[in-house]
């Protein structure tokens, strides 16, 4: 009995030692991290359900569910993520996904894309080449609110030539943060937070549209993406902040309404804050409307 008791004590001592060693390890060593994906994802060519580390695709509903995807591609790739028209990006609760890279755009779609869920998505553009865009969706991006304490969040930074987001955007009780590029020279191009039509629905809407340094600087360049001139457009409930940065050669406008493509812009309950920045040669205004 004495020998058995001694053996048990030795085993307990070993177990305790292992526990103490594990407790001293950093949490990131113990955590199971999702490995990064380095190959561009083109879901327009997919005909069946498929999945990978941090993501899954449901073909019948065209739904991409992100559960902690880290997608990083090189500048040799034109786009990081390509989605079909009518696709939905579902951000799983409590997860954070990051998309990086692409010489022309990080996320591309030929039509409408809907973003929903209570997780977060961060998009970092790469490339900084002529006529490239951080995120280009020439349809409608819809952000749907799911979480009463947060909602889907889209953040863009390190944009390229032009706009962080070039799309007609609909916010339905969601949160949108778009930050344009920061150029050192006027020859590099203009900095725009969001270029396109912005529609807001719901008192929980928050849109933070920020431009930085460039040839010109516009927080929100309000025009119609696509051909033809649009009718009178209305922004509804929600908080919209449009802030311009430093314009090296042209104008710095918080909100610029392009009347060559939009007949008129009306605010229906919108809490709008528009701020112009510094302009080296031309004017700076919070709001400007013209052609």
Task: Give the positions of each predicted feature.
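N-terminal secretory signal peptides that target proteins for export/translocation
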Residues: 1-8
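In a subset of proteins, long, contiguous C-terminal domains/tails are tracked
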Residues: 5, 16, 32-35
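Sec-dependent N-terminal signal peptides
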Residues: 8-19
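C-terminal segment of classical bacterial N-terminal signal peptides
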Residues: 21-30
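A composition-driven surface/loop motif
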Residues: 32-291
